[in-house]
């Protein structure tokens, strides 16, 4: 009889100690799973709320994608999830561009078309495609209203763009006939050249961020349920302890015995057999991987040395379909059947309109940024691999001098400018880059999304709070283990 009270006390007291932090991990984890939620990426908070380490990522949220006026190198427009801006003095001053009817979509990519020496820009947003018929023109709606378009790029013909609808569908569209949209059939695809093994770090990374089990949507739902379970378990556990304690101390305020019993049973059944049991798996893998991410350098060093057979990993790693896996797509001039896409396995190429895809061996199997600028295709990833390839050439060329992943590039005259999270980088010859003096808009504000990262990691409290977070997370793991044991003894 003594075992259950002792185990129950352990479960209860570590739960009360860790409840608040586990609740915060749950709710912020859900927010961070959904970077498509516009309000998270556009709600502004003071820069002072961010740590110095997080401030490095702030410039990327202001401006990721850029276009330069080919007739005036001081005239630029640029955009990101926070909106669109224009400068006419090479970055000294920026003015915000307005969307019709005060709408404010997230800008996910810019496709730059040169038609009869006129510059046209097509914007991929979380609310379909928009267009600027000239860099000084207004922004107008083009097509696919209400759809999350994560990529758009120049197509194989002059008036055409190619894009990706919500990571799952590749489409073509003639900007002069925007209602006539062609979706490429991806139901029967063959994928060759994929690696036989995946390192442990990559698998656990995608698992923690909601890409590692099934499709992007289902994996995110499972992670969300893990976060919701943490919130409900923390709340119901605290309420059960607090109210029973309050009723014992203030018996005159307590409800009737029958109501107390009904309340206790209801809270217990929600806490243990429903949420507690269903949430075991996501809570465990999110907790363990969360501890590993608190010590990222050690985690990378350890995880990259361990290989796992791809066939033994969850369904999504088998790549029986590429739907939900398409981060970016580029087309090639006068070759409608030729395309390249960026995926979790790096670049995949097709020459038959999407029936067969082959992995490009130049890059490691890693997510990256693939895009077209003029007659060049660019690719980079977080492994510090920076490549470009000119149309008509077969070999990728390495780029140097770039500290972080590249989001966009612009040719003007004999010059090439790269845009990444640190700022603007100008080519000095031979695809060697140095940071340029050009600046992005100074918004003097951070985003709520970045602040959620600060809370989730504990940096909002102190850079070394990760050790306390580890302790609380281990407490959560202990509760997940002891909870089913207690339930097996009591059942419903």
Question: What does each model-identified segment do?
Answer:
Residues 66-101, 329-361:
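Extracytoplasmic/periplasmic/luminal assembly and interaction segments
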Residues 32-55, 292-317:
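Alpha-helical transmembrane signal-anchor/signal-peptide segments
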Residues 130, 168-207, 241, 379-380, ...:
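Extended, hydrophilic extramembrane loops/domains of integral membrane proteins
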Residues 64-79, 118-124, 153, 158-173, ...:
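Short beta-strand elements that form the blades of beta-propeller/WD-repeat-like
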Residues 48-71, 98-116, 143-157, 316-334, ...:
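Short coil-to-beta transitions that initiate beta-strands within beta-rich domains
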Residues 1-47, 277-295, 466-470:
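Hydrophobic secretory-pathway targeting helix
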Residues 87-88, 131-134, 172-173, 350-351, ...:
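Conserved Ser/Thr-centered positions that define the repeating blades of beta-propeller domains
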Residues 2-18, 217-281, 464-492:
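Juxtamembrane interface at the cytosolic side of transmembrane helices
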């Amino acid at each position: 009889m003594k075992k259950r009270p002792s185990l129950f006390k352990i479960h209860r007291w570590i739960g009360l100690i860790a409840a608040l932090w586990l609740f915060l991990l749950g709710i912020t984890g859900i927010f961070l799973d959904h970077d498509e939620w516009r309000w998270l990426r556009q709600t502004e908070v003071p820069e002072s709320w961010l740590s110095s380490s997080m401030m490095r990522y702030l410039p990327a949220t202001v401006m990721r994608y850029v276009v330069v006026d080919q007739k005036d190198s001081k005239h630029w427009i640029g955009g990101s999830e926070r909106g669109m801006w224009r400068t006419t003095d090479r970055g000294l001053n920026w003015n915000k561009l307005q969307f019709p009817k005060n709408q404010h979509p997230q800008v996910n990519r810019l496709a730059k078309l040169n038609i009869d020496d006129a510059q046209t820009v097509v914007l991929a947003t979380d609310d379909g495609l928009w267009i600027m018929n000239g860099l000084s023109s207004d922004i107008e709606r083009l097509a696919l209203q209400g759809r999350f378009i994560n990529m758009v790029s120049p197509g194989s013909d002059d008036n055409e763009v190619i894009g990706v609808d919500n990571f799952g569908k590749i489409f073509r569209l003639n900007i002069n006939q925007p209602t006539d949209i062609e979706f490429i059939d991806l139901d029967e695809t063959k994928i060759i050249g994929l690696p036989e093994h995946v390192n442990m770090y990559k698998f656990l990374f995608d698992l923690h961020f909601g890409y590692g089990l099934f499709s992007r949507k289902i994996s995110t739902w499972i992670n969300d349920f893990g976060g919701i379970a943490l919130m409900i378990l923390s709340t119901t556990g605290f309420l059960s302890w607090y109210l029973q304690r309050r009723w014992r101390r203030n018996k005159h305020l307590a409800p009737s015995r029958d109501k107390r019993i009904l309340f206790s049973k209801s809270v217990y059944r929600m806490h243990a057999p429903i949420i507690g049991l269903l949430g075991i798996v996501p809570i465990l893998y999110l907790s363990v991987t969360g501890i590993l991410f608190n010590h990222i350098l050690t985690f990378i060093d350890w995880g990259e040395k361990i290989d796992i057979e791809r066939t033994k990993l969850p369904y999504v790693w088998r790549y029986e379909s590429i739907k939900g896996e398409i981060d970016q797509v580029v087309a090639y001039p006068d070759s409608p059947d030729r395309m390249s896409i960026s995926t979790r396995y790096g670049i995949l190429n097709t020459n038959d309109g999407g029936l067969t895809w082959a992995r490009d061996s130049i890059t490691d199997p890693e997510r990256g940024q693939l895009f077209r600028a003029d007659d060049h295709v660019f690719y980079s990833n977080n492994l510090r691999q920076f490549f470009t390839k000119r149309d008509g050439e077969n070999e990728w060329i390495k780029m140097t001098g770039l500290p972080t992943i590249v989001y966009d590039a612009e040719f003007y005259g004999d010059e090439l400018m790269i845009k990444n999270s640190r700022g603007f980088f100008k080519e000095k010859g031979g695809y060697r880059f140095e940071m340029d003096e050009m600046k992005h808009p100074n918004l003097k504000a951070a985003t709520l999304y970045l602040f959620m990262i600060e809370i989730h990691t504990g940096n909002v409290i102190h850079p070394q709070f990760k050790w306390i977070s580890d302790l609380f997370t281990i407490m959560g793991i202990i509760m997940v283990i002891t909870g089913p044991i207690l339930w097996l003894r009591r059942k419903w």
